[in-house]
Amino acid sequence: SKLEELRQKDGPDSAMLLGSAKFNNEQAYYDRKFAAMFGTNNIDHQARIWHSSTVAGVANTWGYGAMTNSLGDIQNSKAIIIFGANPAVNHPVGFQHFLKAKERNNAKIIVVDPRFTKTAAKADLYAQIRPGTDIPFMYGMLNIIFENGWHDKNFINDRVYGMEDIMAEAKNWPIERVADVTGVKADLIVQITKLYAASKPGTLVWAMGLTQHTIGTSNTRMAPILQLALGNMGVAGGGTNILRGHDNVQGATDFGCLSDSLPGYYGL
């Protein structure tokens, strides 16, 4: 075959396999196995330019680059804060879980987005943030949380390493500075933080609006830190939940259509 001729002539790394977020799990797995049989790690798919910053940021916190809870588990949430995502339009079926949480638990939906979207129209609170200022916004929330003692001290003591460094940095983000940087009124930031901290379990959701920045990986590091501070991890209705852009971005990533990991995120 042409592939075998190429392999014999120029070596296995002369070829590259491009997987797809439209693959189902089995197809993604076989694509990775074919690359291994061919003798190359030159394999990738669309997640490289979509959510690679999420994978890097989240994997450095949890050890793997995936959402921590299922989409259906959002029905168990009592607070849902959404950064840079518009699931009412882009994930209309999945968004039914958000609405079910409102119906079942009187869950509060908070949207942080530069645009007023159809998702924001369903929100209890909406913050029109300046693009690229998500980190100051989250540090402002953390500053309020720590100052008021709303953080989960037992969870942090038992489960979290390095939170004292976050506490120290959060002091550099008083509410007035955060309001100036983000363009969100100080009263609204306090209102959002108080509502989210008081309504547990809370889930934090994001999509491309958080990742597609030069600081995308740093953005996706901050989101889990906020959840850890409140003890919203390891519980139904909590977690950090990333909305993907195509049918099976997560599955194709889980099953190894990547040049730097094997199925199940075993690093190379």
Where are the predicted features?
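Cofactor-pocket helix-loop regions in the catalytic cores of large enzyme subunits
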Residues: 1-247
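Surface-exposed loop and adjacent secondary-structure segments within mature catalytic domains
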Residues: 248-268
